[in-house]
Structure formats: C-alpha cells, structure tokens
C-alpha cells in the first residue's frame, strides 16, 4: 500500500514537472505564434470611394513600377512634365486602411515643389501581393527594398532621397535608416521606436510587468526567426544615430493608437539637443488629424453626420455596401484629404534646406 502511495506521488510530481516545463517550452511559444499571426492576418485595402486617380490632379503623371521584397510590391513613380527635380520623396504609408493612395494630395504637392515621388503599397495592402502584412519588421524590409529599387531607377540615381512616413510607415522610416544612412531627410509622423514594445502596449495594461518579463521575450525570438536580426533587432533610435539626415518628428499628446511615449518622447529625450532634429508636438490631433487641414477635419465630421442622418431617414443600417453607395455619391475626396498647409510648409522647407546643404 505504501509503495502505491509513493508511486501516485511520483506520478503527480511527474505531471506537475511536465506542466511546468511545457509552459516556457511549448505553451508560451505556441501561444505567441498564434496571437502574433492573428494580429497581422488581415489584408488591408482602400475603400473604392476614397481612391484617387492621378488624373484628378492637374499635370500629375504616374508610372507603375513593381519590385521585390518578400513578395512582389507595387509602387508608382510620380512626377510632373517639365520639372527639374530636386530629389525623390519615398512615402511609407500607415497600416489599417490600404496603401499609399490616400496620400495623393501630399504627392501632388511634393511634385509641385520639384520633387519626384515614389509611393508604394506595403505587403498585404492594395495592389501589392500577399494576404497580410505579417508583422511590423516586414514594413522595414519593404521600405528597404523600395529604396533599393529607387536607387536602381536611372532618373533617380543621382538624386537625394527624402522619406515621409506616418504611423507604421514612420516606424519603418526611422528603422530603415539602419540600412540607408545616406538618406538626406526623414519625416516621421505618429511613429513608434520598435516593434516589441509597441506590441506589448495593450496586454501591458492588463498584465503589467509580466508582459515585459515573460511574454515579450517570446515575441522578440519569434520576430528574429521570422524576419531576421537585421530587421527585428533594430530600433528607430539606432537608425537615427547612424545617419546625418535632418529629421522631423511629429506626434500628438492625445494619440491613443500610437501613444506618444512609444515614439516622440523617446526621440525627444535622446535627441533634443541635436540640431539635426526638429520636433512638433500637438495636443489634440489624435493619430491622424495633424496631416489634414481644419477644413478637412470639419468636413469629415459633417460628412459622417450627414451619413448618419441618411441612415436614420432611410431606415437603413450602417453596412459596407450602404456606406460605399452613399459616400461614392456625396464625398469630396480632395477636401476630405486636404493637407495641413502649415505642416506641409515645414516639411517642404526642411527638404529644401537638406538638398541645399
């Protein structure tokens, strides 16, 4: 009887030991992969009613130009006839609502001021391949490949390169400087420093120190396996330290999507005394409003109110097809995306001064 009790205790101890061992070796790694892949499992496209055609902008010429990253990405070379180019602006778009098309009003203005523009759709967005972006570090690789492609184009070869990125795109702009320190100027709007800490922001609110001490090391390991050390183990701070480029960093204090402490505050603490760095901090522009004029912001609210009134009067529900039909008939896209002239002027002045130095 005593031997049976001992063998039962041994069995329990073995089971407990197996469970304890399986947590760090099986359960957490597998859970990390499943959750990570679920976060980056969606393909993003621009709604039809928001898509611009180059023909909507006087004199704007667009030429399709594909290149390879992990997959085939689609970009466009933008210019205006007869222009004498000062440089080429490469645009890295944000994540969640399609590719680079929504920046067309900015693209048009950059060409008006003498800059070629190369805009591309990152992996898993709009006209580019793959079912999903797959992870933040992939955006660095996409931008790295885009710059390599730009430098291989004959009319771009001798031109200085300027970067412009928002959110996910701003993260890739800062980080890609690790691979392209030759960039002359970089503008980063509402970006973040590194993938790992950004991915931990929401679970950190619930689990606290467990996220940094227990979960994020698995995220770091998985990203290193998936994307390689050259894209997963770098930060925007590292990149900015490697270059002599002029840098403009823009953020809003009330940004909830990319909290200011994940980007701007890190950069300000590190580079506030460096004359190469220029900082603009808004208080109430959220994650995206700083890109657009006050007229655009007011118009967006007005358009949404009109749409909600239409739903109420027609007795309809807010569905994709209903919104598409209404917006297609009523939206003024140029007003909806009208650039913030004050911010644009600061960007173009910085580009111009970088080219003249």
What are these regions (language model features)?
Residues 13-15, 20-67, 74-78, 304, ...:
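An N-terminal hydrophobic leader/cap segment in hydrolases
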Residues 95-108, 122, 261:
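The serine-hydrolase catalytic nucleophile loop
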Residues 110-129:
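Conserved alpha/beta-hydrolase
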Residues 133-154:
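Alpha/beta-hydrolase active-site loop
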Residues 242-243, 249-251, 255:
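Short beta-strand/loop motif that positions the catalytic acidic residue
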Residues 274-357:
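C-terminal catalytic histidine-bearing segment of alpha/beta-hydrolase fold enzymes
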């Amino acid at each position: 009887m005593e031997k049976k009790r001992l063998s039962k205790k041994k069995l329990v101890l073995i089971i407990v030991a197996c469970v304890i061992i399986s947590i760090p070796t099986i359960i957490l790694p597998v859970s990390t992969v499943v959750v990570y892949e679920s976060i980056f499992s969606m393909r993003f496209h621009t709604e039809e009613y928001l898509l611009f055609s180059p023909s909507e902008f006087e004199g704007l010429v667009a030429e399709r130009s594909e290149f390879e990253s992990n997959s085939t990405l689609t970009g466009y070379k933008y210019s205006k006839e007869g222009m004498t180019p000062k440089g080429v602006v490469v645009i890295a778009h944000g994540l969640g609502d399609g590719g680079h098309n929504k920046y067309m009003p900015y693209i048009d203005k950059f060409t008006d001021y003498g800059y070629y523009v190369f805009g591309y759709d990152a992996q898993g967005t709009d006209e580019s391949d793959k079912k999903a972006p797959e992870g933040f570090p992939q955006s660095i690789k996409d931008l790295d490949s885009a710059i390599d492609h730009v430098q291989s184009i004959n009319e771009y070869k001798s031109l200085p390169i300027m970067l412009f990125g928002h959110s996910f795109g701003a993260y890739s702009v800062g980080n890609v400087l690790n691979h392209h320190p030759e960039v002359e100027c970089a503008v980063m709007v509402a970006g973040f420093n590194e993938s790992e800490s950004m991915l931990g922001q929401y679970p950190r609110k619930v689990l606290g120190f467990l996220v940094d001490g227990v979960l994020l090391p698995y995220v770091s390991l998985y990203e290193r396996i998936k994307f390689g050390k050259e894209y997963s183990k770098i930060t925007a701070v590292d990149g900015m330290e490697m270059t002599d480029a002029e840098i403009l960093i823009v953020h809003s204090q009330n940004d909830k999507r990319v909290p200011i402490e994940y980007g701007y505050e890190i950069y300000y603490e590190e580079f506030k005394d460096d004359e190469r760095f220029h900082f603009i901090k808004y208080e109430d522009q959220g994650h995206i409003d700083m890109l657009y004029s006050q007229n655009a912001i007011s118009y967006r609210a007005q358009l949404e109110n009109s749409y909600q009134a239409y739903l109420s009067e027609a007795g309809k529900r807010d569905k994709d097809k209903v919104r598409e039909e209404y917006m297609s008939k009523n939206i003024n896209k140029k007003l909806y995306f009208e650039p913030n002239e004050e911010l644009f002027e600061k960007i173009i002045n910085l580009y111009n001064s970088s080219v003249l130095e």
